[in-house]
C-alpha cells in the first residue's frame, strides 16, 4: 500500500506523460491500419485474386484489420485510464495536503511519514505548565492528536483504495473481450477508459459469488472497498446496476440481509456495511430521472417488484416468500440521498402494484405475509413497501408535500381511507362445516402507518419528523394537506378514534399550527369565525399560510390525539404558551376593551382544549389517574420546549417573578388535573371539570403581575372574571360535540 510519504512526493505528472504516449501509440496503430488496408487487405478484396485461397486469405486479413482497429481502441482506453487515475490521485493528494495544513493550524506537527504529534514549540508558558501538570489537558491533547491521526490515515487509505481500483482497470483493459473474433488473447475491442466501469464489473462478479454462496472473505472485503471508493460515482453505479439488473440487485440485497440477520450474525456489520454501499449505489444511479438508465431500471423493477423472492431465515413459516418491492424498500432504508422523483415514482409504482392486485380479485394485500414485522428484531424488513418508502420520503419534506398535496393528486385520500393497510395474515377462514382452508384473514402490522405518519408530518410542517416543531411560516400546500387530513378523518368517522400510529405525528403537526387552532377555538377573526361543521379554508398573508376548519372537526381530531395523553398534553401546553404570548403582545397602555378581547380569546380557546380533556375523563375506557399523570408530563415537556414561542419570562420585565408564578401555576394545575381524574364519570361532575379555567386565571394573573399589578388586585380580578363565561362557552360546546349523551 502507498505510504503517506509516497502519496505526498510521487510525481503524478508521469501519468499524464504516459497517457500522451499511449495516445501516440493509438495514432501509430491508425497509420498501420491505413497501410494494411491499402497494401494487404485491399488485395484480397480486388478482382485479381479469386478462388479458395483468396477467400481464406480474406477472412484472415479481416481479422488482422480488426486487430489494428482494436489496438487503437485499447491504446486510447489505456490513455484515458491513466488520465482518470491522475485526476483521482491529484484530488486525493489535495485532500491529504488540506488535512495536514488544518492539523498544523490546529497546533499539530505532521512528520514526513505522516505521524501526527502535538507541536509544543508554539506553546505559551502557561500552556506548557498545563501540559506538564494538568491530566485533563493532557487527555484532551491526546484525543486531538488521535483524531488528526485517524483523519490523515483514512485519507492515505483512500489513496490505497483508489490505487486498487486503478489496478483492477489496467488488468481488465488488456483482456480480449471477444473470444469469437478470430484471435486468442488479442487486443480488446471493447476497452473502456473509465476506471469505475471496470470496478463495477468486478463488483458484479463478486455479487454473483455472494448470491451463489461462493464468496470468500477477501471478496467481501473487496466489495466493501468498491462501494466505499465509488460512493457517489454515477458511472460505477449505473454500470453495476445495469449488469445486475433489477432482479440481480434484489437477489444481492436479500442475500446480504439473510447473512446479516440470520446466517452469519457475528459478521452482521460487514454485510450491513455492504448493504449500505448498495443502497448508496442505487441512490446515485437513479438520481437523474431523465436518464436512459432510469427508465430502463424502473421498467425492470415494475416487473420484479411484484415477483416473489426467497429471503432465507426471514420467516419461520416454510416456503414464505417476499415480493420484490418489499426487498427494494428494505434496501432503500439502508441508504439516503434519493432524488425526490425516484421516491415519488417508487411510491407510485408500489401503489399501482397493490391496486392491480386488488383489481385482479384478490381480497388480501399483495404484501400480506404470515408473520408480523415490528420491533428491533423484525422491524428492519419493509413488509409494507408503500409505508416504508413514505418513511424514507419523510426525510425530504418538500417531496413529501408534493406527494401528498391534494391539489396535485389523490395520494392523501388513498392513504387516509382508500387503502388496505392489513399486511399480516392472522389466520385462514374455514367455511362452517368445511375442511378446506378458506380465504386469508388479515390484520394490521404493529408499525402500520409509521411511514405515512412521518411523511404527513414532514409534508405539513416543512420539517423533518419525529419531534414537536416550532411555530413557523407554512406554505399553502402544507396547510392544505392538514386541512384535507382533518376533513377526511372527520368525514370518514375516524377522527375521534384515529387510525393506528397517526396520533403522535398529528400532535407534532398541530403544535406547529397552534396560532390557527387558537383562532378556530377563539373565533378570533372573520377567517376563523365559521360554521362549526365547515370544511374551512386555507389562505396566506405576510406571515405565511393559515387554515381554518370547523370547531367540531378540529375538536374531533384533537380528541383522537387525546387517546395519547402525553401527545395531547403537549398540544395543551402549546396552547398555554401561545395564550401567554397573546397577552404578552398587548401593547403597553392598551385600553380595557383590547385587553378584555385578548383575555376572552384565550379563555374560549382554553375552554375548548379543556372540553376535550373533560371528555377523556368522562370516558370509562381510561385509567384516569394515569392518564392525568401522563397528560401533565406532556404539558411539562411542552412548556420546556425552548423557543416554541417567545419564552414565558417575556411576560415580565423581571423574568424570575413571572417564571416563579408559572411554576406555581403549573404545580397547582397538575394537582387539579389529577383530582378531577379521580371523580366519578357523571354528567354532574363533567360540568365541574374546570381545571382549565383555573389555568386561564393563572395565566391572566401572571400577565397582570408582569404589568405591575398585584395578582389579587381589583384590576386583575376584573380581567380574570371577564373570560369566565367564554371559557364555559368553549368548553361546553366542545364537550357537546364530542358526547351525544350530554
Identify the residue ranges that each predicted region occupies.
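N-terminal secretion-targeting helices of virulence/extracellular proteins
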Residues: 1-182, 735, 739-742
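Non-catalytic all-alpha helical scaffold/repeat segments
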Residues: 179-738
Amino acid at each position: 500500500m502507498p505510504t503517506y510519504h509516497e502519496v505526498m512526493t510521487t510525481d503524478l505528472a508521469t501519468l499524464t506523460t504516459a497517457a500522451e504516449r499511449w495516445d501516440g501509440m493509438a495514432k501509430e496503430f491508425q497509420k498501420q491500419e491505413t497501410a494494411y488496408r491499402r497494401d494487404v487487405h485491399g488485395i484480397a478484396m480486388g478482382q485479381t485474386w479469386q478462388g479458395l485461397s483468396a477467400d481464406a486469405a480474406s477472412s484472415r486479413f479481416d481479422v488482422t484489420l480488426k486487430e489494428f482497429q482494436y489496438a487503437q481502441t485499447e491504446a486510447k482506453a489505456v490513455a484515458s485510464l491513466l488520465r482518470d487515475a491522475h485526476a483521482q490521485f491529484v484530488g486525493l493528494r489535495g485532500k491529504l495536503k488540506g488535512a495536514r495544513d488544518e492539523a498544523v493550524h490546529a497546533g499539530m506537527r505532521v512528520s514526513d511519514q505522516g505521524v501526527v504529534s502535538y507541536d509544543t514549540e508554539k506553546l505559551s508558558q502557561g500552556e506548557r505548565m498545563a501540559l506538564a501538570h494538568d491530566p485533563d489537558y493532557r487527555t484532551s491533547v491526546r484525543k486531538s492528536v488521535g483524531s488528526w491521526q485517524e483523519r490523515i490515515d483514512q485519507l492515505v487509505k483512500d489513496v490505497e483504495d483508489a490505487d486498487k481500483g486503478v489496478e483492477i482497470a489496467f488488468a481488465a483493459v488488456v483482456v480480449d473481450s471477444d473470444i469469437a473474433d478470430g484471435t486468442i488473447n488479442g487486443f480488446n475491442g471493447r476497452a473502456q477508459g473509465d476506471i469505475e466501469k471496470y470496478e463495477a464489473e468486478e463488483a458484479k462478479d463478486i455479487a454473483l459469488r455472494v448470491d451463489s454462496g461462493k464468496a470468500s472473505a477477501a471478496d467481501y472485503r473487496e466489495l466493501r472497498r468498491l462501494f466505499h471508493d465509488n460512493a457517489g460515482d454515477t458511472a460505477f453505479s449505473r454500470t453495476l446496476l445495469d449488469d445486475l439488473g433489477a432482479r440481480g440487485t434484489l437477489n444481492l440485497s436479500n442475500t446480504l440481509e439473510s447473512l446479516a440477520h440470520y446466517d452469519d450474525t457475528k459478521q452482521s456489520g460487514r454485510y450491513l456495511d455492504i448493504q449500505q454501499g448498495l443502497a448508496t449505489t442505487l441512490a446515485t444511479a437513479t438520481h437523474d430521472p431523465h436518464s436512459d438508465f432510469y427508465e430502463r431500471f424502473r421498467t425492470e423493477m415494475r416487473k420484479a417488484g411484484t415477483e416473489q423472492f426467497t429471503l432465507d431465515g426471514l420467516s419461520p413459516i416454510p416456503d414464505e416468500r417476499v415480493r420484490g418491492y418489499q426487498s427494494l424498500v428494505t434496501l432503500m432504508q439502508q441508504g439516503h440521498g434519493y432524488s425526490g422523483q425516484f421516491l415519488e415514482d417508487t411510491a407510485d409504482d408500489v401503489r399501482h402494484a397493490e391496486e392491480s392486485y386488488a383489481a385482479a380479485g384478490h381480497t388480501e394485500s399483495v404484501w400480506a405475509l404470515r408473520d408480523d414485522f415490528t420491533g428491533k428484531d423484525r422491524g428492519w424488513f419493509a413488509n409494507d413497501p408503500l409505508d416504508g418508502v413514505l418513511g424514507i420520503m419523510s426525510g425530504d419534506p418538500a417531496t413529501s408535500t408534493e406527494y401528498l398535496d391534494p391539489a396535485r393528486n389523490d395520494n392523501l385520500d388513498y392513504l387516509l381511507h382508500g387503502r388496505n393497510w392489513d399486511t399480516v395474515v392472522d389466520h385462514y377462514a374455514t367455511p362452517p362445516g368445511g375442511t378446506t382452508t378458506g380465504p386469508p384473514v388479515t390484520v394490521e402490522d404493529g408499525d402500520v402507518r409509521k411511514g405515512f405518519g412521518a411523511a404527513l408530518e414532514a409534508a405539513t410542517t416543512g420539517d423533518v419528523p419525529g419531534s414537536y416543531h416550532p411555530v413557523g411560516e407554512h406554505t399553502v400546500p402544507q396547510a392544505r394537506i392538514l386541512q384535507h387530513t382533518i376533513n377526511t378523518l372527520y368525514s370518514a368517522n375516524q377522527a375521534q378514534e384515529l387510525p393506528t400510529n397517526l396520533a403522535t405525528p398529528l400532535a407534532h403537526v398541530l403544535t406547529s399550527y397552534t396560532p390557527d387552532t387558537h383562532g378556530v377555538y377563539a373565533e378570533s377573526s372573520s377567517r376563523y369565525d365559521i360554521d362549526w361543521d365547515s370544511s374551512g379554508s386555507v389562505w396566506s398573508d405576510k406571515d405565511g399560510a393559515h387554515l381554518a376548519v370547523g370547531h367540531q372537526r378540529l375538536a374531533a381530531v384533537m380528541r383522537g390525539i387525546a387517546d395519547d395523553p402525553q401527545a395531547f398534553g403537549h398540544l395543551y401546553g402549546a396552547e398555554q404558551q401561545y395564550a401567554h404570548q397573546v397577552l404578552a403582545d398587548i401593547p403597553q397602555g392598551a385600553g380595557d376593551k383590547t385587553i378584555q378581547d385578548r383575555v376572552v380569546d384565550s379563555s374560549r380557546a382554553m375552554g375548548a382544549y379543556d372540553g376535550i380533556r373533560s371528555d377523556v375523563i368522562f370516558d370509562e375506557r381510561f385509567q384516569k389517574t394515569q392518564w392525568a399523570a401522563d397528560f401533565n408530563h406532556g404539558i411539562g415537556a411542552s412548556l420546556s420546549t425552548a423557543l416554541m414561542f417567545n419564552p414565558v419570562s417575556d411576560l415580565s420585565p423581571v423574568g424570575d417573578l413571572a417564571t416563579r408564578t408559572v411554576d406555581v401555576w403549573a404545580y397547582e394545575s397538575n394537582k387539579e388535573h389529577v383530582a378531577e381524574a379521580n371523580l366519578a364519570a357523571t354528567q354532574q361532575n363533567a360540568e365541574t371539570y374546570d381545571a382549565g379555567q383555573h389555568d386561564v386565571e393563572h395565566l391572566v394573573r401572571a400577565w397582570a403581575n408582569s404589568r405591575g399589578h398585584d395578582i389579587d388586585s381589583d384590576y386583575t380580578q376584573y380581567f380574570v372574571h371577564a373570560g369566565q363565561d367564554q371559557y364555559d362557552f368553549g368548553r361546553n360546546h366542545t364537550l357537546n360535540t364530542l358526547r351525544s349523551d350530554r
